[in-house]
Each structure stands twice: as structure tokens, then as C-alpha cells.
Amino acid sequence: MVSEFCKVAGSKASHPSGVCHDVAMANEPGEGCIHVVIEIPRGSRNKYEIDHDTGRVFLDRRLFTATTYPADYGFIPNTLGGDGDPLDALVLLEDPVYPGVWVEARPVGVLYMHDEAGEDAKILCVPPREPRWENVHDLDDLTPQLVAEIQHFFEVYKALEPGKTSSTGGLAGREAAWDEIRKARGNYKGPAH
């Protein structure tokens, strides 16, 4: 049941907690890897969000543009990004997965962004044990076309939505991605007691 699987409490005014945060993970990610909780499958125009109060996965909206998510999209547990939400991440999987699925991922880069909520970096990741991605360890290992498609998506995906904005501010490699992850982990304070 989704509501029991991935409850995320908190909001921009507080911080995330629940079973997607503050849990001792029985299956820790391998060295150089993180967990990403997927909210939106690759190829979707539907923007799903995990409700911060109930833990249910809701359809937030359908993108107003004719674009689709270029990769599985979600968040890194136990982090707090510049926009007050968990740090966003994309995982370049061959086949899309369902909202609520935890994926082990290897960060290879970061896309710097800004939207109506503030700083909104996106960590770019690949699956660590998939042969197609075994030689991808840094941003420069991705094809320029794939990187351009991801960047273009985030430049235009909110273009037709009233009151929404997004702009990209460049890309950086693996070390910058880990810097963002460490910063977001440092920002995360855990549940209020």
C-alpha cells in the first residue's frame, strides 16, 4: 500500500520525515551510490507527488507542455535542497519504474536550476550494476545529446503554466553532484521532536 510505503511528512515550511527519511536501511547503497525514491516515471507527462501528510502518491498535474520526463525522477531521502524539499534526482534507467520505488543510483553530475521556489538542483544518476552504464562515472561520460535533452526539458517543462518558472544554470560533474548531496544532507535535520 503506497500510503504505508512512502510517507513523507513536512513541507517547505518544515522538513521531510517518515519512512522515506530517518530510517535505518536494511539494504544500504553500495560505495559511491545513493538511494533515490522515484516519484515520476520516464516518459510521463503526469507529475506525481508523494503527499507530505498522508504518504499517498497523487497526480499533482499533467505537464502543460508537450514534453515528457527524460528519466525517472524522484528525490534523495534524508536531504533538504535549496527549495525546501528533498534534493531532486534523475535516474537514467532503460525502463521506467513506478512511483514509490527505491532505486540504487550512482551520481554522475548535477544540473543547476532555479524555479519559483528558489534553488532547485537536479542530481543526474545511473544504475550502478547495469552493463549499459558501467562506463559512466562522470557527466562527460554521458552523450552530449542526452545531456542536451535533459537540460532542454527543464528549461521548457513549466513554460505554459501560469505562475511557474524554471531556468537552468549550467551543469557540473560527479564531484559537484556529491557536494550538492553533502550540502543537502547537512541541511536535513531529521524529524521535529
Question: Which positions does each model-derived feature cover?
Answer:
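Hydrophobic N-terminal alpha-helices or hydrophobic patches in metabolic proteins across all domains
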Residues: 16-193
